[in-house]
Amino acid sequence: MSISPTALSIVHPVAVTPAMLVATNIAETDFPAWEVGTTYTLGQRVIVLSNSRVYESLQDSNVGRDPLTATTWWIEVGPTNRWRCFDRSVTSQTVAEGTDTTTISYTLRPGQAVTALAALNVTNATSMRVRLVDATHGTVYDRTVSFASQPLQSGWWNWFFGQRQQPTQQIMTDMPSAFGNADLLVDFVGGTGMGVGALVFGSQMRFGIGLQYGARVGIQDYSRKETSAFGDVILVRRAFAKRANFDLFISNNELDSLQNFLSSIRAVPCLWIGADRYESTILYGFYKNFDVLIAYPEHGECSLEIEGLT
């Protein structure tokens, strides 16, 4: 018996480059742009526009030293606000700021078919609109989803009076595959300081007949939890990563293609969509290992251990 009647979907994300970015309302104004003639002090931060990264000065009297090459004078902090939703971290967010603090918009030209998209670690948003616009056929996909809060428990009392929680992610897997040259437009609307942790999209591969019951999901917590010599507990809250163990029914005629595909994406972060009804079975990360059991003449079983990114 399977937990999901649909196949396991694996999305190998498109690596977003500056050449793909057609338009956005997120400016690169986190810090001043680095200038060769400016003197920087210890701890001062700058942006290198050529790679959209933030760097921090490691010394005083820092002048004329290129952050890209002078590694004893500069340390890389991370991407600019514009590019945080495209890095390999779910925790870091692109935040709506500047003159427009309630919308985040991107127009991208991936140069390939996009059949699935996920927005992860989204905070303070009310809606997300995704469109595919082809130069010849016009708008070929247009869908808007809501981030309206939902009751934590079922029942009429909880619907009207119980606690509610806002979704932090949205997944779209119904995008058409016939428009490889279409522009991808993504628009978020929300409250002040809205943030998007990861915007992941690409072509999806489907394998198997469904996930078996017995799937295990959880998190790996990287918080600091120590006890001092006097018995005091020291707690420092840090990032966490989702994790999951899936057992998948597969047809034996797709066994080789599954193994070859998984081998090709080793150590590559992908989007894993287990069962649509359980948000916990949707992860952005990599598989640690997998095993395929040829159990029956027509069907087999595949066990996957997946670790999400922080």
Q: Where does each model-flagged region fall?
A:
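Tryptophan-rich substrate-binding surfaces of secreted polymer-degrading and adhesive proteins
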Residues: M1-V95
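Extracellular/virion structural assembly segments
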Residues: S2-P18, P79-T99, T107-T310
